[in-house]
Curated annotation (Swiss-Prot):
Modified residues (Phosphoserine): 216, 365, 367, 376
The name this protein goes by in its record: Golgi reassembly-stacking protein 1
Region (Disordered) location: 1-20, 204-252, 342-451
Source taxonomy: Eukaryota, Metazoa, Chordata, Craniata, Vertebrata
Function: Key structural protein of the Golgi apparatus. The membrane cisternae of the Golgi apparatus adhere to each other to form stacks, which are aligned side by side to form the Golgi ribbon. Acting in concert with GORASP2/GRASP55, is required for the formation and maintenance of the Golgi ribbon, and may be dispensable for the formation of stacks. However, other studies suggest that GORASP1 plays an important role in assembly and membrane stacking of the cisternae, and in the reassembly of Golgi stacks after breakdown during mitosis.
Species for this entry: Rattus norvegicus (Rat)
Gene that encodes the chain: Gorasp1
Keyword Manganese among record annotations: no
């Protein structure tokens, strides 16, 4: 006895349907499954007609193994089973199973799905399970949807045996229920019944028709984690982003980008408790504190829009201070600064539009003048090697200490000792009309030559 090879669905759609299998019977020992199995062949005889062929062949093979071909509705396949008919097993019949000749093509449609089960109802007292139990048969033949409801009405107040299949345990059991319309609720069974295509038994055990899980009890509310929320004054569970020009992009999923949460640095500095605060050192956040040890970098420098009325070259060294061969008496404080530029004269100030380096010299070029300074002027201070300043005739703007230039630097410059004769610092003018080479006023501390 046992299972043999399986094959596809056979031709024809009739066979002997097993409605019930008794315990310890030859049918149970052979592995026959109630409701889902159809005996279509015994020996070499095809059982496609309602006659006594099955009974006769079973009697002819008492206490002898006989092969059966069985079609299963769950797997939709045919398998071979070996059974030993016997009348000594302790029950009724040679197989210990009740059979009925019918078509297995529409047998899966005759199913009544148990839905909601009310507490203390006849269905609940009988042990029917909501959404996983399927009523597949009874003592009477059920072929239409109305047959089941007619059966319930005819057994009002009387016990009724039902064959029930459970999709969770994948097994059939016999349930005895007593319909009672006066149980205190709706209906005679107190349960919902579904019939039709959407309420058929699935080919494999599934939770498709299971009742959705109930909501959490009031005493135990569900906790939903919020990634962007953390206690006030406590460090966040993620490190602070540094020098990020935009949101960091996380994993890409299909057609959208997931942006990881970010916390501004200023916000975290306000939220972190200080050494003297009450909450400092009291909370233990484990590994979260290690992520807060990342040093914060200063913000990028502020880029200011310069006023077109003057040239801001503060903080730039236009001459090599280490080379003293050009101007021995020129100190580091007398380099070209906004104050030094203002000392050149009322017409020596212009607006600049760009600055760049070319050919080993630093050049500031604008729409109105150009200043060039060589990196290495040479071993001797000569006039031809000094930077030249060319201004147009129409330049009339002048800068004053009140417009942004430092008056203190101007006074410090005038206090330096004179190392060059005043006649050598006089202005020299040359070139075509419309171009003027301006020389600074005779002041001590300035080198001789055009600027």
């Amino acid at each position: 006895m046992g299972l043999g090879a399986s094959s596809e669905q056979p031709a024809g759609g009739e066979g002997f349907h097993l409605h019930g299998v008794q315990e310890n019977s030859p049918a149970q020992q052979a592995g026959l499954e109630p409701y889902f199995d159809f005996i279509i062949t015994i020996g070499h005889s095809r059982l496609n007609k309602e006659n006594d062929t099955l009974k006769a062949l079973l009697k002819a093979n008492v206490e002898k193994p006989v092969k059966l071909e069985v079609f299963n509705m769950k797997t939709m396949r045919v398998r071979e089973v070996e059974v030993v008919p016997s009348n000594m097993w302790g029950g009724q019949g040679l197989l210990g199973a009740s059979v009925r000749f019918c078509s297995f093509r529409r047998a899966s449609e005759h199913v009544w799905h148990v839905l909601d089960v009310e507490p203390s109802s006849p269905a609940a007292l009988a042990g029917l399970r909501p959404y996983t139990d399927y009523i597949v048969g009874s003592d009477q033949i059920l072929q239409e949807s109305e047959d089941f409801f007619t059966l319930i009405e005819s057994h009002e107040g009387k016990p009724l045996k039902l064959m029930v299949y459970n999709s969770e345990s994948d097994s059939c059991r016999e349930v005895t229920v007593t319909p009672n319309a006066a149980w205190g609720g709706e209906g005679s069974l107190g349960c919902g019944i579904g019939y039709g295509y959407l309420h058929r038994i699935p080919t494999q055990p599934s939770s498709q028709y299971k009742k959705p899980p109930s909501a959490s009890s009031p005493g135990t509310p569900a906790k939903t984690p919020q990634p962007n929320a953390f206690p006030l004054g406590a460090p966040p569970p993620w490190p602070i982003p540094q020098d990020s020009s935009g949101p960091e992009l996380g994993s890409r999923q299909s057609d959208y980008m997931e942006a990881l949460p970010q916390v501004p640095g200023g916000f975290m500095e306000e939220q972190l408790p200080g050494p003297g605060s009450p909450g400092h050192g009291t909370a233990d956040y484990g590994g979260c504190l290690h992520s807060m040890e990342i040093p914060l970098q200063p913000p990028p420098p502020v880029q200011r829009v310069m006023d077109p009325g003057f040239l801001d070259v503060s903080g730039m060294s236009l001459l090599d201070s280490n080379n003293t061969s050009v101007c021995p008496s020129l100190s580091s404080s007398s380099l070209l600064t906004p104050t030094a530029v203002s000392a050149l004269g009322p017409e020596d100030i212009g607006s600049s539009s760009s600055s760049h380096e070319r050919g080993g010299e630093a050049t500031w070029s604008g729409s109105e003048f150009e200043i060039s300074f060589p990196d290495s002027p040479g071993s001797q201070a000569q006039v031809d090697h000094l930077p030249r300043l060319t201004l147009p005739d129409g330049l009339t703007s002048a800068a004053s200490p009140e417009e942004g230039l430092s008056a203190e630097l101007l006074e410090a410059q005038t206090e330096e000792p004179a190392h060059t004769a005043s006649l050598d610092c006089m202005a020299q003018t040359e070139g075509p009309a419309g171009q003027v080479q301006a020389a600074p006023d005779p002041e001590p501390g300035l080198c001789e030559g055009p600027w």
